[in-house]
């Protein structure tokens, strides 16, 4: 019995306390130029409050998804979203949860959501803009596949009252980004430009607990994640590269394919184990994934974890500038070795 008690870790760190600790560390560092680097870039506490509001929405969404089938939230809502996809019932309710949480915290001035055609301007004095895909992978949710919420945060430009120019900016100007994956457990990955930390929701106490500190992607792993059903529509170089990954030689084993069809689930595995995730352009389009609330946040996380994120041409994702709220891009992101191999292959 004593042995069992000794194995229980009671030195837990919640997301709320982690955010406050990092803010205090920032304040202390800038008073005496000592102390460890921290993740919270703004010492006013406004970003801390915003992150706490986000985690509330993630808890609410996680609870809603767990009960979805029992309370008839599975299926279509009959509404078409900003990108032309027919909304699931869960898309709508989780979008409402997210927007309500952002409007009520007093720190958020602008909201961009996949489910909303236009920019939402909040009646507040907030200094931040939040971009979000409330439920990524919702087309698979009826089958019980893991889905997630992806988010990014910009600080408004100096002197701005809040307009579209505050979000039509390069991804490298985001101050925070992350996602929450809703599966067997709810897993939250967060960065504010200094490391990536992972949290797991303990449903008994209702708190996200720090479980993965300072996450780093493996430099190489022989797994790729891509929808090969579109092979016939890819550029020839891209098709040849994927074929190259599957080649077997005396010196190289073929790569294994792992594709779930939910970006958050596929990327969670890729960040933990390494490898490559890609969603290239099909002929005649500019890609499927949206820059502001899919490509940028994931690229921000991947780079902070030691990986690389580029588009079909090999251009850095975080250097791109979206032309519209729902502008799209191709994307290749993952371990340093795999993405560099792709870049060298297409040159």
UniProtKB/Swiss-Prot annotation:
Family named by the database record: Belongs to the FBPase class 1 family.
Naturally occurring in which organism (per UniProt): Schizosaccharomyces pombe (strain 972 / ATCC 24843) (Fission yeast)
Annotated positions binding Mg(2+) 3: 133, 136, 294
Name the UniProt record assigns to this protein: Fructose-1,6-bisphosphatase
Domain of life (superkingdom): Eukaryota
Reactions it catalyzes: beta-D-fructose 1,6-bisphosphate + H2O = beta-D-fructose 6-phosphate + phosphate
GO molecular function list: fructose 1,6-bisphosphate 1-phosphatase activity; metal ion binding
Gene: fbp1
Keywords tagged on the record: Allosteric enzyme, Carbohydrate metabolism, Hydrolase, Magnesium, Metal-binding
